[in-house]
Amino acid sequence: PYLLRNRYEVFQFSKGGGLIQELVSQAFYFKQYNPDMVILHCGIVDCACRAFTHKEELFFQSNIIGKIIRKLLSTIITTKRIRNFRRKSWTTPKDFVRHIEQLKQQFSNIPVFALSILPVSCEYESKVPGIKFKVEKYNELLKESFGDKLIDLSDIQQIGIMSDGHHLTKAGHQYVLKKIIEKLLIFNL
């Protein structure tokens, strides 16, 4: 978003580790700015392979019994092993689509675009088995939901992605800026 400020007035809402449902719950506040368009960048936190569902994690964190159970499970079987076996996502595909539609309804009078989730490298897949399948699935949901308003990042070069597999480098930010501007020009924005 920072690089877009040379061409557009930008109101940015970012939440590290944020889920799409949290973006939807804040949409009313974003709407007060009367934006000309919305560009959504979410999905990796929603679809990433996890040991436990979001509700399970909240239970573990909310009380002493949950914390003890979580500690025992993680001691007996590592969280990584549980994750690799269960491959849970914090947002189900059905809920992901439902939240997308809710967000689009909130901004029904303006164009709503979405960035695809970054492609998964072999290294990232080896660290988090199953992530490639999940990302492809959720990208397909984004494509179905946004159609020609999806900004496809699938051809980003690996130099544009940090070693963690899901954050952008300086080159990656430049690439995304180029892709956003190309798409906005198609829509005369």
Annotated model-derived regions:
Residues 1-38, 143:
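Serine-esterase "nucleophile elbow" of acetyl-processing enzymes
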